[in-house]
Amino acid sequence: MIPLKIAIAGANGRMGRVLVEAVNNHPDTVLSGALEHSGSEALGLDAGYAVGLKTGIAISDDVDAVLAQSDVLIDFTRPEPTLKHLQKCVEKQVNIIIGTTGFDDAGKAAIRAAAEKTGIVFAANFSVGVNLTFHILDTVARVLNEGYDIEIIEGHHRHKVDAPSGTALRMGEVIAGALGRDLKQCAVYGREGHTGPRDPSTIGFATVRAGDIVGDHTALFATDGERVEITHKAGSRMTFAAGAVRAAVWVNGKTGLYDMQDVLGLNNR
């Protein structure tokens, strides 16, 4: 089997370094390129320097050159650079795995449009456990559909720039969808001051940013006399990286927009 050639965007970032390691660990993939922004101090260094690997791939800011020798790009950066990389992937007929969060509606529309021409796996979280949690939440919300207050609590490291996390929002979307609600209409983000009694139709969000928390997410369903809490805690970024590489292998040869539920066979298509 010819190894799948994978490039990593943001290769010197916290997630990018782990992605380099994950590609190296997978028996069916090979690192074909590593991207960083112009001016990065890491340009020219071996992509594996930070994790003790010698990959033979130098970190570059030449997107065209990197994509020309790659089958797929994995991007866990920020919305603006991800959308630029997305357009390049369409031009070069390179598939893309998007783990970036914080897109606005226009950004999501651009991803949907690009999926008509290339294969995209776009997910809020690439952990197998988190995606199984999404699947479970759909069932739980359908059963606990009356008389339960729903809150989503998430925690991440001090460096995370968007809140609530993409995973927390996806949990909210899954729950709202199961209940026949529109999350944009029923979400409450944080509470302060005299808020009055809780509206039973709302889904609340609370955010923690502290230390080096990799990712903690809890969906709470509470009523008189009982609470149901569904929690996922990530202890290492490798769980996300390994899932992203799995998605890259899965989407090879496909066109269209997919998520991690598709990769794991949890969606009925």
UniProtKB/Swiss-Prot annotation:
GO terms under biological process: diaminopimelate biosynthetic process; lysine biosynthetic process via diaminopimelate
Highest taxon listed in the record's lineage: Bacteria
EC number: 1.17.1.8
Any Pfam family matching the protein: DapB_N
GO molecular function: 4-hydroxy-tetrahydrodipicolinate reductase; NAD binding; NADP binding; oxidoreductase activity, acting on CH or CH2 groups, NAD or NADP as acceptor
Enzyme category, top tier: oxidoreductase
Ranges in a coiled coil: none
GO cellular component, one term: cytosol
CDD domains recorded: DHDPR_N
Active site, per annotation: H156 (proton donor/acceptor), K160 (proton donor)
Residue sites binding NAD(+) per the record: G10, A11, N12, G13, R14, M15, E36, G99, T100, T101, A123, A124, N125, F126
Record key words, sorted: Amino-acid biosynthesis, Cytoplasm, Diaminopimelate biosynthesis, Lysine biosynthesis, NAD, NADP, Oxidoreductase
Pathway stated in the Swiss-Prot or TrEMBL entry: Amino-acid biosynthesis; L-lysine biosynthesis via DAP pathway; (S)-tetrahydrodipicolinate from L-aspartate: step 4/4
NCBIfam families documented for this protein: dapB (TIGR00036)
Family, similarity comment: Belongs to the DapB family.
Protein name: 4-hydroxy-tetrahydrodipicolinate reductase
Species lineage: Bacteria, Pseudomonadati, Pseudomonadota, Betaproteobacteria, Neisseriales
